[in-house]
């Protein structure tokens, strides 16, 4: 009987301890850009190992989905690969840059051109140029692999290229016959499977595209590397930002943001093929 009482006491103590731990555990839910998934996945893996009382999660559904989720209290932090809109700032969104990225253009293996001008690139994206022959390639229709409109990459290309080259709103629109996919990985996969195709991805995915046998284009005779991006020779580049709302910030949120911008966090950014803010 005495042994049974001791066993019950030990089980009760264990359950009480576990419940207390669960009550004390802070959940930091993050949502946003698919581009930064490799960075966030590795950061979270390392952070969760050294912070027993905090569990960080990442839901890569796109920059706009992440920011909307922040305002709707689904996420405590959003990660965006596009700039905040005026409306988002007015709603209380606050940004912190934690990395830099460039958008690079990849083509299927049979496209042998190595360089393209910004103007011709923009004309491919809006449909003014329809055949590879018009830019020195084979006589074949151009198949364009595009991102969905909630993607930060989609918005960034529109701002950095289409709006830069074209003067009217009508011209600065993506062509309607693009094949729409939801992530950088899907762009690489679709481009590898679709003859005579072109798509765009983040710099951190360059190695993956090369492994698939795809070509990376120089733009205005400049190949995208960390050096040409840092020196502003390659100009199709953007900030990767942490988005918070002052109304919902707490200590667990600020601690993870501090980790992201720390030397350890920045090493992870570089390891994943992107550019750190302290580069």
Curated annotation (Swiss-Prot):
- The lipid of kind N-palmitoyl cysteine is covalently joined to 19
According to its UniProt entry, the protein's GO biological process terms are: phosphate ion transport
Identify the InterPro entries for this entry.
Answer: PBP_domain, Phosphate_ABC_transporter
Pfam families annotated for this entry? PBP_like_2
Q: What superkingdom does the record give?
A: Bacteria
Lipidated positions (S-diacylglycerol cysteine) are: 19
Establish whether keyword Nucleotidyltransferase is in the entry.
no
For membrane topology, the record states: Lipid-anchor
What this protein is reported to do is described as:
Binds inorganic phosphate with a Kd of 1.2 uM. Part of the ABC transporter complex PstSACB involved in phosphate import.
Q: Which family does it belong to?
A: Belongs to the PstS family.
Protein name (record): Phosphate-binding protein PstS
- The organism encoding this protein is Borreliella burgdorferi (strain ATCC 35210 / DSM 4680 / CIP 102532 / B31) (Borrelia burgdorferi)
What is the gene name? Answer: pstS
């Amino acid at each position: 009987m005495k042994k049974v009482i001791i066993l019950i006491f030990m089980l009760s103590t264990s359950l009480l301890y576990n419940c207390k731990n669960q009550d004390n555990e802070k959940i930091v839910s993050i949502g946003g850009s698919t581009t930064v998934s490799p960075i966030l996945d590795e950061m979270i893996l390392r952070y969760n190992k050294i912070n027993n009382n905090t569990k960080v999660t990442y839901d890569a559904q796109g920059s706009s989905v992440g920011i909307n989720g922040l305002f709707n209290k689904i996420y405590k932090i959003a990660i965006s690969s596009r700039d905040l809109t005026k409306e988002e700032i007015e709603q209380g969104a606050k940004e912190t840059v934690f990395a830099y990225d460039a958008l690079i253009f990849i083509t299927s293996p049979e496209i042998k051109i190595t360089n393209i001008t910004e103007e011709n690139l923009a004309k491919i994206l809006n449909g003014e140029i329809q055949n590879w022959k018009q830019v020195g390639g084979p006589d074949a229709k151009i198949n364009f692999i595009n991102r969905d409109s909630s993607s930060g990459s989609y918005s960034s290309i529109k701002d950095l290229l289409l709006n830069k080259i074209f003067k009217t709103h009508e011209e600065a629109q993506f062509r309607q016959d693009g094949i729409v996919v939801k992530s950088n990985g899907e762009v690489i996969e679709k481009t590898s499977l679709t003859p005579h195709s072109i798509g765009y991805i983040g710099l951190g995915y360059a190695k993956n595209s090369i492994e698939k046998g795809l070509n990376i284009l120089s733009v205005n005779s400049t190949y995208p590397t960390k050096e040409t991006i840092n020196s502003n020779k390659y100009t199709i580049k953007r900030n990767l930002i942490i988005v918070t709302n002052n109304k919902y910030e707490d200590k667990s949120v600020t601690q993870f943001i501090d980790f992201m911008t720390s030397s350890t966090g920045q090493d992870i950014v570089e390891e994943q093929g992107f550019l750190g803010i302290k580069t």
